From Swiss-Prot:
It catalyses: RNA(n) + a ribonucleoside 5'-triphosphate = RNA(n+1) + diphosphate. This is DNA-directed RNA polymerase subunit omega. NCBIfam families: rpoZ. The lineage of its organism: Bacteria, Bacillati, Bacillota, Bacilli, Bacillales. It comes from Shouchella clausii (strain KSM-K16). Belongs to the RNA polymerase subunit omega family. GO terms for biological process: DNA-templated transcription.
Length: 70
């Protein structure tokens, strides 16, 4: 079984699209800037996307919704 499971991840974010967007953006941050260390102490994954997914399931990474201009 894969960790973290898609069911656990979808409890944290509202859609698969949001999940992919947030995890890809975070993975790119970690890859391009070595100062951005993982928020997870001992990640099970060695790939950036896997680490980002672990951060989401541990509530260390969430999606920000921009405020609409009125």
């Amino acid at each position: 079984m894969l960790y973290p499971s898609i069911d656990n991840l979808l409890e944290k974010l509202d859609s698969k699209y949001s999940l992919v967007t947030v995890s890809a953006r975070r993975a790119r941050e970690m890859k391009e800037d070595s100062a951005r260390v993982p928020l997870v102490e001992k990640p099970k994954s060695y790939k950036f996307v896997g680490i980002a997914l672990e951060e989401i399931v541990n509530d260390q990474l969430t999606k920000r919704v921009p405020k609409e201009e009125q």
